[in-house]
Amino acid sequence: MLGRPKIVLASGSPRRLALLNQAGIEPDALRPADVDETPKRGELPRACANRLARAKADAALKSVQLDDELRGAFIISADTVVAVGRRILPKANLVDEASQCLRLLSGRNHRVYTAITLVTPKEAFRQRLVETRVRFKRLSEDDIQAYIGSGEWRGKAGGYAVQGIAGSFVVKMVGSYTNVVGLPLYETTTLLAGEGFPIRFGWLNTVGV
């Protein structure tokens, strides 16, 4: 894309891509990283999110350095962690994992942390961590089983996707909604603008959206 620096999203998440597009930013490439997202023993939620976002950015940078067309691009990575207290919930891929997450979240408060890592064209690293507090309604067993049947939870931190059916489970939310979806837009665009990325460049092309 001519007229602005190139930008790479270090993620294969359709949700993060859609959020970046929502802000009028279309990445020139996607570089999802194959990173082991298992929390370390005793690792706190904030530390886990920061570590994984940095690891994804590191992996994307190595890929970009080998690509003549992308070398010197901005790189954005993110990692989202859902936690009850200090307990980190998994990115559920199995029915049992998702069921356990939903039973734990039922009628309770939890926190969603997303760490963003920005790599500048000069390969400096900038990072932000965003926290949102969420409270779910008390879920019946019928709620849980029907939601499991939807398949919407698969691969999602904490076993739910707030932008879908699970949005109806939320009694209260304090903080950024887009953070819970997977990419806090205010903090992401502020980080980019602070490093000289022209965040308004694509706005004129979104009139028909």
From Swiss-Prot:
InterPro entries: ITPase-like_fam (IPR029001), Maf-like (IPR003697). Keywords: Cytoplasm, Hydrolase, Nucleotide metabolism. Its main location: cytoplasm. Its EC number is 3.6.1.9. It catalyses: dTTP + H2O = dTMP + diphosphate + H(+); UTP + H2O = UMP + diphosphate + H(+). GO terms for biological process: nucleotide metabolic process. GO terms for cellular component: cytoplasm. Gene3D superfamilies: 3.90.950.10. The record marks R15, T80, Q163 as: Important for substrate specificity. GO terms for molecular function: dTTP diphosphatase activity; UTP diphosphatase activity. Its cofactor is a divalent metal cation. It is found in: Cytoplasm. The active site is at D79 (proton acceptor). It is an enzyme of class 3 (hydrolase). NCBIfam families: maf, PRK01441.1. Belongs to the Maf family. YhdE subfamily. Nucleoside triphosphate pyrophosphatase that hydrolyzes dTTP and UTP. May have a dual role in cell division arrest and in preventing the incorporation of modified nucleotides into cellular nucleic acids. PANTHER family: BIFUNCTIONAL DTTP/UTP PYROPHOSPHATASE/METHYLTRANSFERASE PROTEIN-RELATED (PTHR43213), BIFUNCTIONAL DTTP_UTP PYROPHOSPHATASE_METHYLTRANSFERASE PROTEIN-RELATED (PTHR43213:SF5). This is dTTP/UTP pyrophosphatase. It comes from Bradyrhizobium sp. (strain BTAi1 / ATCC BAA-1182).
